[in-house]
Amino acid sequence: MEYRSLTLDDFLSRFQLLRPQINRETLNHRQAAVLIPIVRRPQPGLLLTQRSIHLRKHAGQVAFPGGAVDDTDASVIAAALREAEEEVAIPPSAVEVIGVLPPVDSVTGYQVTPVVGIIPPDLPYRASEDEVSAVFEMPLAQALHLGRYHPLDIYRRGDSHRVWLSWYEQYFVWGMTAGIIRELALQIGVKP
């Protein structure tokens, strides 16, 4: 697939045809969810945030809107939608959820479910001053180009762990966020 020519229809048909295989086994029992917001355009965008430098965990990192599932959430999808509204003012009613990717175990002890949703192009994003320092949109075709991600093998607590690294403009995209974007690319059939 030529990544420069990815349309929203191409993305949707590939995502719907190749449904993710969900592995129910997990090392972590605390649940979290992130929204992967795909901006509805002829050439779609991928909405990302940069976390505030004042946060205790993952300060300054590029991330999808999301967080822990709490007692008021009916599901991981509800948690992702709630967090997106809290962090960047995306109303849950504006998100067309098209599916989820397999959960990812985080280094902070959460099982994170990526929820894929389509959002309108004209939403007035407002970053939560406490949690988000920037909101930006990356062309989806560029985000899903696997050649932009570089592996780094690190050792943590005696175990080898692979993280993925990339840049977009002034933003350093790495770790779980880069891994989720790569998983989305693989899910729609992009070849390494």
From Swiss-Prot:
Gene3D superfamilies: Nucleoside Triphosphate Pyrophosphohydrolase (3.90.79.10). A motif (Nudix box) lies at residues 67-89. Residues 29-160 form the Nudix hydrolase domain. SUPFAM superfamilies: Nudix. It comes from the Bacteria. InterPro entries: CoAse, NUDIX_hydrolase-like_dom_sf, NUDIX_hydrolase_dom, NUDIX_hydrolase_NudL_CS, Nudix_NudL. One of its GO terms (biological process) is nucleoside diphosphate metabolic process. Its EC number is 3.6.1.-. Its cofactor is Mn(2+); Mg(2+). Keywords: Hydrolase, Magnesium, Manganese, Metal-binding. NCBIfam families: PRK10707.1. Belongs to the Nudix hydrolase family. PCD1 subfamily. This is Uncharacterized Nudix hydrolase NudL. It comes from Escherichia coli O1:K1 / APEC. The lineage of its organism: Bacteria, Pseudomonadati, Pseudomonadota, Gammaproteobacteria, Enterobacterales. The gene is nudL.
